[in-house]
């Protein structure tokens, strides 16, 4: 994973929801030489952060027997950019999940105020995976020790 856009998972409820945090700092690789006078976190990074957490929730909820690929985002509301130096809390939930795809939604809050959301995210499922590898990756990337 080239850009892991969350720092850790703070809670997960199988088949239902996931919450995680991300601290956006001035030293983010995607800000390097991108903005000369007033660095701003690009809005697409908020979308990617929310999408990554929802993707892992789906994989976790299916017992690491599949991986996901993003197929649709609708109703995305994101800020035009925020200055680095803030911590975001991301919450994502599954609305429905089946063997072929999953539907979810996500929000991103800064200091308790919702600043971004995606009303509808659809992920397709890919079933030819190594469940043990996915479980190890999730344990490492999430910061959850019990996996």
Named regions from a protein language model:
Residues 1-41:
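Catalytic strand-loop segment that frames the active site of acyl-thioester-processing enzymes
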Residues 3-5, 88, 102:
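Hydrophobic core residues within well-ordered beta-strands of beta-rich domains
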Residues 8-11, 75, 80, 94-96:
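A residue-level detector for short acidic-glycine micro-motifs
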Residues 11-17, 81-84, 111-113:
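A short, structured loop/turn motif at beta-sheet edges
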Residues 22, 91-94:
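Short, hydrophobic/aromatic-enriched beta-strand segments in well-ordered soluble domains
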Residues 34-42, 46-55, 70:
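Compact, glycine-rich, soluble single-domain proteins
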Residues 53-91, 117-119, 123-124:
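Hydrophobic beta-strand-centered segment that forms part of the acyl-chain substrate-binding groove
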Residues 84, 93-147:
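HotDog/MaoC-like acyl-thioester-processing domains
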